[in-house]
């Protein structure tokens, strides 16, 4: 329990078998206001508030009819979409098993597989209005390696979005700062009319993550090229 004089922060007793890093993580979770808020409001993760804050600033969710959530587990972002767009068709995809969410279709598969774009479009009933991605690669503890691995995922997500979005659609994705993000932004500007970025208040201050909000999808380049053949 917390004691007077520590600013309301909780401390946990050390236990055999716990590493210093795991104790630090548990301590941070116990004292994180977003974790407590998520538990109180029924969200599966604190990441839900990142999407809420991004949408409050950029207004991309309201009116969406078809939404894809890449890397849905544990499901916090899809929960937000359900509350903001209760009539929307939502399909989430992840390699990890994810507990069901009312009103959402969840596919346990690799979004980079050849079958994924067609399978998700079929489940949605048409092209997507929005593709969301809060994915990050498993970290190895080396900052540049972690950055490059996550950027490869984001770029794959961008390619996927270009295959399933309707013209005028939106792609929102997590990015880790580190150098390779410049090439991604250039590609997004080629595919979308507006590309903005932000770090929502719910992102931890010591995190290198930020989010890209690409709106106004111009349409598939190959489709435009086919007309001229």
From Swiss-Prot:
Gene Ontology CC annotations of this record: cytoplasm
Chemical reaction(s) catalysed: uridine(2552) in 23S rRNA + S-adenosyl-L-methionine = 2'-O-methyluridine(2552) in 23S rRNA + S-adenosyl-L-homocysteine + H(+)
Protein family: Belongs to the class I-like SAM-binding methyltransferase superfamily. RNA methyltransferase RlmE family.
Annotated gene: rlmE
Main location: cytoplasm
Organism: Rhizorhabdus wittichii (strain DSM 6014 / CCUG 31198 / JCM 15750 / NBRC 105917 / EY 4224 / RW1) (Sphingomonas wittichii)
Subcellular location: Cytoplasm
Region of interest (Disordered), ranges: 1-20
EC number: 2.1.1.166
Function field: Specifically methylates the uridine in position 2552 of 23S rRNA at the 2'-O position of the ribose in the fully assembled 50S ribosomal subunit.
Protein name in UniProt: Ribosomal RNA large subunit methyltransferase E
One Gene Ontology molecular-function label: rRNA (uridine-2'-O-)-methyltransferase activity
């Amino acid at each position: 329990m917390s004691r007077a004089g520590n600013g309301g922060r909780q401390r946990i007793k050390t236990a055999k078998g716990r590493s210093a890093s795991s104790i630090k993580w548990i301590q941070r979770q116990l004292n994180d206001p977003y974790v407590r808020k998520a538990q109180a409001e029924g969200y599966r993760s604190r990441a839900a508030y990142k999407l809420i804050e991004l949408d409050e600033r950029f207004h991309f969710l309201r009116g969406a009819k078809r939404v894809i959530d890449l890397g849905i587990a544990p499901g916090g972002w899809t929960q937000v979409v359900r509350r903001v767009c209760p009539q929307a068709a939502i399909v989430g995809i992840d390699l990890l098993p994810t507990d069901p969410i009312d009103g959402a279709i969840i596919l346990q598969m690799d979004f980079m597989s050849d079958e994924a774009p067609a399978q998700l479009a079929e489940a949605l009933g048409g092209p997507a209005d929005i593709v969301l991605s809060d994915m990050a690669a498993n970290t190895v503890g080396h900052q540049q390696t972690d950055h490059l691995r996550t950027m490869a995922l984001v770029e794959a997500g961008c390619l996927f979005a270009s295959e399933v979005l309707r013209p005028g659609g939106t792609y929102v994705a997590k990015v880790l700062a580190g150098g390779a993000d410049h090439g991604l932004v250039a590609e997004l500007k080629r595919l979308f009319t507006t590309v903005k970025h932000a770090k929502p208040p719910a992102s931890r201050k010591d995190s290198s993550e930020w989010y890209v909000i690409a709106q106004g999808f111009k349409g598939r380049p190959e489709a435009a090229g086919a007309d001229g053949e």
